[in-house]
């Protein structure tokens, strides 16, 4: 191996583990957290933009008010209770019926500089207390945290029972409806929004309901709190600059998600050597690794993070064990070859058992075990302790034996096109979240691709790295060639299922279907036209998603395709620190409206536009609008062609009109004019 390639591989390994992108706060400096003890037994957590006041009457703690210091708006809470518990017998109590065990404590938060969750690397201030309700045999540890440079206060509640507490519902945020507070999305786990403020239970199954007087955020609790099983849940109260709700909320999410935004460029075997119920083998997998190694990693110096092997590696009659004919040594050889070129191995697993005949066989095997693996209407159930521990053991062994860098978890709980778990799959999703936390504790840098069974709640990102956009894996929509219709379908369902249903969900954290150039499924019928493939590649990388899926048979690509793939993926990598801000621009692809993605940072911006129709169309690019610029930010930009990398200025100014030919994809780098 040549020296420069060896150095390049070392660079890849370092970058894979430690690259972190962070979004800029779109307002004035937030500043260090402060905690003040005020006369009258009150405590205030604050910084330059946010302020929250708690009152201690010697028996308990209540919320007095929450303030946006920049907008000069204070929500007076009237000494509101910290929480409300509903029990199985329909009785209701609030935190006012708990008593302080000891005087509350104020303290500094010690930063963990090695944490993968960005907020954990920061210091701050904490106000905490312990409560008890002797009659119920319940204790609570509560804390309110404000980290340095945060635009939000988090409250963490940990309930512990002396024996068993049959709590059925926990209400943690209760706001007066007359202030105009609304639910900020159509799915469970959406935050509540009041002007430029946001409030939420940090859980994908959190729900919002309205009464005559209040809008409340609550979580159903279907599993009793017991002496050996505590319940921890958290809330957030935050604020954003006026006109910057999406970006201000994103700033919070990027700090608190399990891992900040990162790009995971990888080959996926589905549509290629994996398909339906067929099995593949080590030689086929090694061929794909070596082809990508030679054509992309070495020849074109592209960082390929992983090779993920989808359904087809296992023996259906063993449940998540290798088929010995295809993989007599498991993934040992694959891992060795992948790691030698600076990459890694990923693997597909389906919590509920997969699909079609393979699923039937796996479930039949599970039923015949002693004791049998638990199931629900959709397949295996992680809520069952027998199956949970089997699934956990399998995933732990993949990490231990093959240093797996990513899991694709395909199929859990309610399945595809869900907007929440419902009562039927609530326990299954709780178990799934626990599984993700268990795995992240074993390997904090692990990438977890959460697919079928998720919905557009940002709080999935507290546990994994992305969700599925919902809809079909692939389809056709709109006009043009079959591949152009495939692009329109992919992006159209992102628009309908995420942009519209979960407007505060980060578009950077989606599995949207990737690039498919392979042998099986609907994409096999797509003509491999170089122009269409280029449009597919650039529109995909222009979407800014961190999960960069290449469902590609490398033998199908010609030199033009390889060069395009290399240029587009490297362009995305060069803009990794901008991509977290990616947001929607334009209209509905399926209605043949011009659309695209944009992302902004104080240093530079990017813009991708596509015309999904067979007619020439014009689009007005107003920099302030497409980049959603904060107030008092310059909006005079120079636009350059990202595809060619040319230094020729294509457009300049605050606004310009662009003409897009039928099915044209344009990608711009934008720099402030000097």
Regions found by a protein language model. Give the residues of each.
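Acidic-aromatic substrate-binding/catalytic surfaces of carbohydrate-active enzymes
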Residues: 40-130
